[in-house]
Amino acid sequence: MTLVYQSTRDENNKVTASQAILQGLATDGGLFTPLSTPEVALDFDQLKDASYQEVAKLVLSAFLDDFTEEELDYCITNAYDDKFDTAAIAPVVKLKNHYNLELFHGSTIAFKDMALSILPYLLTTSAKKQGVDNKIVILTATSGDTGKAAMAGFADVPGTEIIVFYPKDGVSKIQELQMTTQTGANTHVIAIDGNFDDAQTDVKRMFNDVDLREKLLAHHTQFSSANSMNVGRLVPQVVYYVYAYAQLVKAGHIQNGDKVNFTVPTGNFGNILAAYYARQIGVPVGKLICASNENNVLTDFFATGTYDKKRDFKVTTSPSMDILVSSNLERLIFHLLGNDAAKTKELMDALVTKGEYTLAGADKDILDLFAAGFATEDETAAEIKRVYDENKYIEDPHTGVASAVYEAYVQKTDDHTPTVIASTASPYKFPRVAISAVTGKDSGDDFKAVEDLHQLSGVAIPAAVDGLEHAEVRHKTVVAAADMQKAVESYLGV
């Protein structure tokens, strides 16, 4: 039976996986979400010897079950190749107190590569399956990493165009240069005078603008998304949690069947939601620990049941988590409410009109899987230094947040279940922050910090950063948040 994906806001809006990938966001504003848990035969005594590609095929064939075996082989083979600097794709590294699942070995040295390497192939395959020959325009808001990874994936892919919005003062220098130097005739990067939530809100609005949709269709063009609201982004992230567990079994760190905890640095909630789905298909998970920075709206939600975005937006050293409207939480809310679209829509409408909602009648078994905490800027820096002092291993600030939250969780609960931290970016993406945390000194410049980091860590400078300082800046457009649609229409000539 084909797995059904339904909008979180309309029980009558049901589609297949390929239809969900092609649409990106449901026309009613909801997110396409699997109505049931697919059956996956997870035999870790066998999977421990499987390649990343083999695990991907097992997981994706269950979630994307309207794709043929040949179609999935094509997507997986083209996605997980020598774009990654290790054959393991996502290696697990043992540190003194926890394990790091390194998700930054792709072409843009951030975890977004794990899904955005395959999304272009899933999307173009979905278009063929649905008989769609419109130009597909990827419209995306980024808090730093998604934009570059999406452009790297879609650059010069026939039949596609990609437009990325990012907050002008809300990303690191390295992140900004990675985006503004991106090549590819079909890539467009636009800075906005505003924050990530401003960008994401208007991208969602454009997706739901019926007049704009009709205007685009008249030009044989349609939107899709590279954000984690697209299931084509979300489902591939489930793979690496399955793979991580298999690697722990293979290394003898755990026995097959032992529970593990996953600690995930969290902004838009997609990465930790993928860990939840991994648990649902059979990965033995004890706790899912949701780690936030000082934008701790999720910590408060799990503590109180109230989601309240009415608070100051803080710019931190972990910019990919500087988010107050956590889009993918909507999918968890939908599950917590027994897949009730009407109730979910009511809460999401309240978030828009009142700036908050309170969850009532939630599935306690699901809620109890989660723990949540946040780390301040000082706590994050101190944790990066502690991890370095104990392991001679340098974490990026997002991983540092997760590590600090995990340490606090252990202090509070005395839960010493083996724990994997999703290490979401290379420290080379945030070199000044990493060097400052470890040495107490500011390198004064991102590229000086890259050299300092190389000297301190002995880790080779990744190709994604090497040469970036002198690369040509190709994208220089800055617009007001209110003018995002005008910019899109201008680029697309509609």
Regions found by a protein language model. Give the residues of each.
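PLP-dependent amino-acid enzyme catalytic core
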Residues: 1-494
